[in-house]
């Protein structure tokens, strides 16, 4: 595995693979890798000839009161897992490498970002599409791999790829979970012992919502209340940031219960904000 830190070296390495007619699979991450990330790598390994992973904690997608400085980082750990997983290039740029000067232009997400994380984290998705536009141009992948846990981000990135004609196939991979159902996340390390024991209730609540919808329930308020009551059975969380249903991938109010629906939750613990979701009537690509 080659570790690359600057743009020019990355572009030259990618060009060499392209000249050899190799297909490129790309896994963008913010590091502190876990089994969820490595599942994305496994899919990339099977479906493409050459796998690139980036580890970059992107400052533009963090709000002023969020955990950019405290976000867990461990490059040695990441490099070890990436190499063991079959990554060919690990791109680990500095902030200055990706943002060498103040931006002269700004990307702004218009659709799919006004609710849930878009409402709760102002400017978050603008930062996501900004950094991915840069990284997509640098890596020039055939396939890019994302996890379903970040379903709203996936919908936003799909819009970016469609709007700006990126020749990239987005591959959406099912959320990887702990044995007790908690979605794998780099932020899980922030949980106290009691919080970690209780956090799987998020997934349990979302499954209740799925069961209600699949049994024919269309009273949205009732569905949300049942899920809220379930989460509140475990009192260690500080608050429920959101618990809602929307059409997917549009993120508009549900009007047709036979089409794509997302049930999404964000729950705040003392030092961690955890997200999870269930997709209904949606085929992963």
From Swiss-Prot:
**Which GO annotations describe the biological process of this protein?**
pantothenate biosynthetic process
Record-listed beta-alanine binding positions: 61
* EC number of the protein: 6.3.2.1
Q: Which UniProt keywords apply?
A: ATP-binding, Cytoplasm, Ligase, Nucleotide-binding, Pantothenate biosynthesis
Gene Ontology CC entries for this record: cytosol
Question: Per its UniProt record, what NCBIfam families does this chain match?
Answer: cyt_tran_rel, panC
UniProt xrefs under PANTHER family = CYTIDYLATE KINASE/PANTOATE-BETA-ALANINE LIGASE, PANTOATE--BETA-ALANINE LIGASE
What does this gene product do? Catalyzes the condensation of pantoate with beta-alanine in an ATP-dependent reaction via a pantoyl-adenylate intermediate.
- Family, per the entry? Belongs to the pantothenate synthetase family.
Q: What is this protein called?
A: Pantothenate synthetase
Q: Which organism is it from?
A: Listeria monocytogenes serotype 4b (strain CLIP80459)
Lineage of producing organism:
Bacteria, Bacillati, Bacillota, Bacilli, Bacillales
């Amino acid at each position: 595995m080659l570790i690359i830190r600057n743009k020019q070296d990355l572009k030259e390495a990618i060009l060499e693979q392209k000249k050899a007619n190799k297909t490129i699979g790309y896994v963008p991450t913010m590091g502190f890798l876990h089994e969820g990330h490595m599942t994305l790598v496994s899919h990339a390994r099977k479906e493409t000839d050459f796998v690139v992973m980036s580890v970059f904690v992107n400052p533009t997608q963090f709000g002023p009161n969020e955990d950019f400085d405290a976000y867990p980082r461990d490059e040695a750990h990441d490099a070890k897992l990436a190499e063991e997983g079959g990554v060919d290039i690990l791109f680990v740029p500095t902030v200055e490498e990706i943002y060498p000067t103040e931006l002269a232009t700004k990307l702004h997400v218009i659709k799919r970002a006004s609710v849930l994380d878009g409402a709760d984290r102002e400017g978050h998705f603008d930062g996501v599409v900004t950094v991915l536009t840069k990284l997509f141009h640098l890596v020039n992948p055939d396939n890019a791999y994302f996890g379903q846990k970040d379903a709203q981000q996936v919908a936003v990135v799909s819009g970016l790829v469609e709007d700006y004609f990126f020749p990239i196939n987005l591959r959406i991979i099912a959320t990887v979970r702990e044995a007790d159902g908690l979605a794998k996340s780099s932020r899980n390390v922030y949980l106290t012992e009691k919080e970690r024991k209780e956090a799987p209730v998020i997934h349990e609540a979302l499954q209740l919502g799925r069961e209600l919808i699949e049994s024919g329930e269309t009273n949205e308020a009732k569905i949300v209340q049942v899920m809220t009551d379930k989460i509140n059975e475990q009192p260690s969380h500080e608050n429920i940031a959101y618990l809602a249903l929307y059409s997917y991938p549009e993120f508009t109010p549900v009007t047709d219960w036979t089409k794509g629906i997302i049930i999404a939750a964000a729950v705040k613990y003392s030092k961690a904000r955890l997200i999870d979701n269930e997709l209904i009537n949606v085929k992963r690509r």
